[in-house]
C-alpha cells in the first residue's frame, strides 16, 4: 500500500529530467531561430489583419534609396535613367515631378517608355532642383494610392563648368569615340552653326530632338554638343578663321548657337573635312532636317576657361595641423637630427601619399606643389639637408623638404607657364580692309587673311636647382590647390612685364568701323603669365587716358580696341598700350593707327540715305551711339561684319544718315543687288520696312529711306522707284582727285532741286511782268466806268453840222419870231438930250444894244445867225455859249 502510493505521487529524479528535456526540444523545434524573424512574422500578421479590417486607410509610404544625385551644365544635354524596378512593380504608375509641385522644371522632360529623365538647361535654370519620383497603384475607388517615393537633386552649373555632368550621365557605349581633351593651355577649335530659333520657346523635348537631328551632319553624339541662345545679338564670332553662309536671308528670332569640338589648336590647313556641314547649310538640306533656318556657320579657336586663383588671406592665424610628408627611401640611413620648427606641430609618420614620390628634378618636367590658404612659415635648416629618419621627438626632416599638408578638400589644378625663351618680331596688325568682293554669290567659305606668325609656345626652362624649401601650415580650410609650375616663384621679387611682340600698326578707313583684339602674346609676366592676365590701358603721348568722346576706344575687360574715324582723322595717330601686373609694375608698347580715306571714294554704285527722328548732334558727338548706329545698319542688311558699312555723312533735318555698302561691286552697275538690298529695308515709295524699323529700335526711329544710284549706276533711282532716265552718250567726266566726297550729296541737291526751282521761278516772274505791261498798254486812253457814267448822265445831245437841213434853217431861239407880212416895229421914241446927268434912262442898255438895228434898212431881211457848230469842237462835252445876252423885244404894237 505504501509502495503504490509513494510511486504514484512523487516521480523519480530521472523521469523529471527526461520530461524537462523533451519539452525543451519540442519548444525549440517550433520557435523561430532568431528573435527578428518572430517580430517580422508578427508584424506581417498584424499588417494583414489591419489591411483586411481597414482597407480604406492609406498605408505609410516607405522611402526607397537608389537614385543618386546628379549635376547638369547650361547648354549641355542631361539624361538619367530612373531605376523603376526599385520603386514600382507590375501595375504601378510612376510619377516624376519637382518636389512639392505637380510638374517638372521647365527644362526637364520625362519619357515614360524608356523611363528616362532628360533635358537641356539654360542660363536661367542654374541652381539646385529637387526631383520627386513616386509609384502609385490604382485603388478601388479609381484614385492613385502612393506606394513608394524617392527624392534626388540635380544641380545646374554655369556654362563654363569644367566637367559637364552630361558626359557622365549619358553613359556612352563602349565603342563610342571619347570626347576630345586638349591641354590646359591649348585652345579648342569649335565649329558653331547659327540657327534662326528661340530656345526659350522650345520645349525640353524639342531641344533634345534638335541635337539628335544634328548628329547626322556633325557626326557627334548629342552629349558632346552645346546649344545656347544668342546673347546681345552676337551671332558671329569676330575671331573666326573660317565661315560660311546658310539658307536664311534674314533673322527673325533671337537666334541659337549649336557648337561642337573639332580638335585642338587647328588652323585653316589642319581643319578636317567640313563639307558635311558647309554644303547642307548653304543648300537648305540642314534647315529642312532641323526644322529651323540656318543663318551660317563659323570655326574659331576658343581659349579654355582656367579656374581663377582664389584670393588668400595673408594674416591668417596659423593653426598647427598634422602634415603627412611623402615617403622617402634611403639606401644608407644617416644619423638622425632634430630641426627646430615653430610651435612644434606633431608630424605623423608617412602613412598616406598625397603627392608624387620625391625624386630629383627631371629636366623639362614641372614639379608639383600643394598649397593651402593661410600663413606661410619658413622652416630654418641647419647645414646641408640630408635624408633622415623619424626621431624620438616625432619630427621628420626629409632629404628635400617638400611643402606638405593633410587638410582634405577639393584639389584644383592650375598651370603656370614660363616665358618663352625666344622672341620674334610680330608683324603689323591691321584690320581687314573692306575690299570689294566679286559678284559671284556662290561663294560659301570666307577665310581670314594669312595667319600672323607668332612666337613659339612657351617652353619651360630647364633647371636642376632644387625648389625653395617651404613648410606651410594653415587654419582649417575646405579647399587646396595643386599648382604646376616650370619655375618656382616663391620668395623671388616681382618682375616687370616684358614686351614680346609689338602691335606696331593698325590700319583704319574713314567711316568704317574697326576693332582689334590685343593678342595674348604681346606681353609676358613671370608671375601673371600671358597678356590676358594683365591689366591693359590705352593712353596718349602725355600719359593721358583716352576719353569717352575719342574716336578710338578700348575695352580693358575684353582687351578689344575699336573705333570709327571720320574725314578729320585722316593721317597717322600714335598711342601707347600699358600692361600692368598685379604688383603694379608695367610695360609699354607704342603703336600707330593709320586712317585712310574711304576705300571706294565716290565710285560707290549706290548711296543709301535714311531719315531718323532725333537730334543729329547727339549722334555725331557720341562715338558709342555712332558705332551702335553702324552696327544696327549692318544688322538690318543681315551683315554681321560691320565693316561692310561705310558711313558717309550725318546731317540735320532730324537725323539724315548717308552710307554706302562695301559689298557691292563697282563695275558694272550691280542693279539687281542694289534692288535686292533696297527691297530689304524699304518699300517702293520710300517707307521703311518692318525689319529695318525693328533693327534700329529702340535707339533710332526710321521715317523715310532713299536709295540713289551713283558711280556706274548714277542714272538710276532705286527708292522711291522711278523710271530710268536716258542720258545721251558723253565722254566720261574727268575725276577730281582732291574732291571732298562729303560735298557730292550737296551738289546733287543743288543740281536736282535748287537750280530747277530757281529757273522756273525766274520764268514765271518774267511772264508776269510781260503780261502786266501788255495789260497797261491795252487799257491806256479808255475812260473808267465812273467817267463813262458821269458823261452819260450830265451830257446833252450833239448835232453835227452835216446833220442840219440847209434849206430850212431851224428857228433860232436867240431871235424873235417875225412874220414876213409884218412891218417892222416903230423905232423907239426920241427923247431930248437935256436929261439930268445924274439920271439915266431906264432903257439905256436896250437902246445901246439895238443901236445897230436902227441904222440898218428897215426893209432888210431879218438877222440870220450862223449855225451852232460850224467849227470843230475844242473839247469833249463843251457847249457853245451865247456871248451876247438876249432880252425879250418890246411888246408888239399892231399898226
Swiss-Prot record:
Region of interest: O-glycosylated at one site: 49-71
Region (Required for binding DMD and UTRN): 880-895
Region of interest (Disordered), residue spans: 381-500, 724-747, 823-895
Region (Required for laminin recognition), start-end ranges: 30-408
Keywords: Cell membrane, Cytoplasm, Cytoskeleton, Disulfide bond, Glycoprotein, Membrane, Nucleus, Phosphoprotein, Postsynaptic cell membrane, Secreted, Signal, Synapse, Transmembrane, Transmembrane helix
PTM note: Autolytic cleavage produces the alpha and beta subunits. In cutaneous cells, as well as in certain pathological conditions, shedding of beta-dystroglycan can occur releasing a peptide of about 30 kDa.
Biased composition (Pro residues): 859-870
Residues covered by the Peptidase S72 domain: 603-712
Chain positions of motif Nuclear localization signal: 776-782
Residue stretches of biased makeup (Polar residues): 393-403, 832-846
Intervals of motif PPXY motif: 889-892
Any one Gene Ontology BP term: muscle attachment
Intrachain S-S bonds: 182-264, 669-713
Record field: compositional bias (Low complexity): 413-447
Transmembrane segments: 750-775
Signal sequence bounds: 1-29
Record topological domains on the Extracellular side: 654-749
Protein name per its UniProtKB record: Dystroglycan 1
Organism: Bos taurus
